[in-house]
Amino acid sequence: MPPRKKEYGIKRASGSLVHFRAPVSATTIRRHSAVVPSVLTFAVIVASGGLLLMIEKGMLNSVQTPPPRANGRKVEYRLRSSSDTAADVESQIVQEIRNRTIRSVCGQRNMPHSVWSLSPLQRKTLLQHILVNDEHRFLYCYVPKVACSNWKRVLKVLSGALANVDIKVKMDHRADLVFLSDLPPEEIRHRLRHYFKFMFVREPMARLLSAYRNKFGEIEAYQRKYGAEIIRRYRKGYAKDKKISGNDVTFTEFTRYLVDEDPERMNEHWMPIYNLCQPCAIEYDFIGSYERLESDASYILERVGAPQHVRFPERQTWYKPVTKETLHYYLCTVPQKFLKELLPKYILDFSLFGYPLPNTTTEYCRH
């Protein structure tokens, strides 16, 4: 057996290692100073932009990538072409940016530093969104509208509940899945300390638009429960005694509803990612992104030692992507005053995960 290769990453204050896929020289990335979250937002965007520009220029393409380790088990690694190297390095840089940013923001005195320092409501929400796989020793915090249904399929295949990810069955989002909230405190502590922990993020406004189009355009239960209430609250001139189906909520009405909602009590499909997964309270080993879903998911499957035949599902043919043009169109239909009230509710999702704030100026929206 060849000697085990060195692991790469940065050590947290607790001594644990944040894993990356390849080494990068110290001159590649500069340290960011810790500042309060409101100021950090813009500093992160500027710093991230410079690093990603370096990636686009191909400055790091020659760095070699070691195979990920998988909890000490032998893994039949998927074959990787040489063209994957640049993508691996780019992903590593994105991880480095996110980890430095998270450490800066989460180092503030008023931020939670463990699961047990959260309020009962915050802890309940978090533990109900973390899925457990004991065989491969990992925890996955799922975020609705960030490919979580496909990840649940993968977990069911790994546990033997499904033969493969392509089986055409209606997804039951609770059956055959183990949630961290199902376990007693001592077992929760053990898994948080010893298991590989990951989550996936998405551009916050694209995630909201995806939820809006899906839930209010296709799901009758959401139209009745939320759509009808939104119309009663925010639509001018509607007759109070008129029966409302809730299937024609506008995106502006939806944003007004979000502005008035408490982020900690929102429906999970539009609750901020920060509130769902609490990245300050849990030290995630890997934070993947929807924008790099295929490569990041492939890395996770290798990292946890998934069998060769287990793969991440392809997107369904009926899937309607949120393109930049589509997002631009919808955001520009919302009055500026509502967006200015909405964005602060998701400011930690933008700043922690390195997403720039959307440009919705009048000049930009003319195009």
From Swiss-Prot:
It is a single-pass type II membrane protein. The chain crosses the membrane at residues 35-55. This is Carbohydrate sulfotransferase 14. One of its GO terms (cellular component) is Golgi membrane. 3'-phosphoadenylyl sulfate binds at residues 144-150, 202-210. PANTHER family: CARBOHYDRATE SULFOTRANSFERASE, CARBOHYDRATE SULFOTRANSFERASE 14. GO terms for molecular function: dermatan 4-sulfotransferase activity; sulfotransferase activity. Its EC number is 2.8.2.-.
